[in-house]
Amino acid sequence: MRIDTVNVLLEALPYIKEFYGKTFVIKFGGSAMKQENAKKAFIQDIILLKYTGIKPIIVHGGGPAISQMMKDLGIEPVFKNGHRVTDEKTMEIVEMVLVGKINKEIVMNLNLHGGRAVGICGKDSKLIVAEKETKHGDIGYVGKVKKVNPEILHALIENDYIPVIAPVGIGEDGHSYNINADTAAAEIAKSLMAEKLILLTDVDGVLKGDKLISTLTPDEAEELIRDGTVTGGMIPKVECAVSAVRGGVGAVHIINGGLEHAILLEIFSRKGIGTMIKELEG
């Protein structure tokens, strides 16, 4: 047992050295938010990353909690082509749940476990300037990222804080916009030239049949979309990953957030447990 523990630490050591002082943007969502054990493990992982000298930044989702709050208030959620139709009343609920509830719960748990977390949203310091998303027709106050102003994030991480970001952006029209958390995380990672973007999902990574693909280049990832290997909800995640890598992010990891300590297992081990997308070295 003791030798096993030593071996785990020795395996992690070169990665701890390599990533010391580097910025990781982590999208927290899916199973990791719904399962209590996974939620607790996520908090522990973030604290451990921080204590090994990594600078973690969290971007979180919260779709199921938004739908539940709407139902509790007697409002039936409406979806169009898989996207939430967000009228003014729905946007108020989105902001209330993401910014006022989920964000503060994550911040509280990080701080209770020895972190120094600060909760913000994309409206703070105009972190995320948004514009209306029209690709899927008019679905209300659903936005896409027009610009990221990362100065507030630099200020927080340079002063040893862990930023926790709710993906609600501000439009130049003064409206709040609900932004997909994967997209927000990718754009923030690009603005910071982050070492890594980690997307927590409900599956083990990119699959070919039932087999996990451990590593991909952006070109290979795009080919898997074209040939139909990557389908459904994994398509936008892979597209986010490709965009991030081509935008200067060192690597993107798509991993199963329902697996306890998934982040540590992916980052600090040779084999990893998910899919890593990065450019070929050299």
Swiss-Prot record:
GO terms for cellular component: cytoplasm. It is an enzyme of class 2 (transferase). GO terms for biological process: arginine biosynthetic process via ornithine; L-arginine biosynthetic process. GO terms for molecular function: acetylglutamate kinase activity; ATP binding. It catalyses: N-acetyl-L-glutamate + ATP = N-acetyl-L-glutamyl 5-phosphate + ADP. Keywords: Amino-acid biosynthesis, Arginine biosynthesis, ATP-binding, Cytoplasm, Kinase, Nucleotide-binding, Transferase. Substrate binds at G62, G63, R84, N178. It holds the Pfam family AA_kinase. It is found in: Cytoplasm. Its EC number is 2.7.2.8. The keyword Nucleotide-binding applies. Pathway: Amino-acid biosynthesis; L-arginine biosynthesis; N(2)-acetyl-L-ornithine from L-glutamate: step 2/4. The record marks K27, K237 as: Transition state stabilizer. Catalyzes the ATP-dependent phosphorylation of N-acetyl-L-glutamate. Belongs to the acetylglutamate kinase family. ArgB subfamily. This is Acetylglutamate kinase. It comes from Thermotoga sp. (strain RQ2).
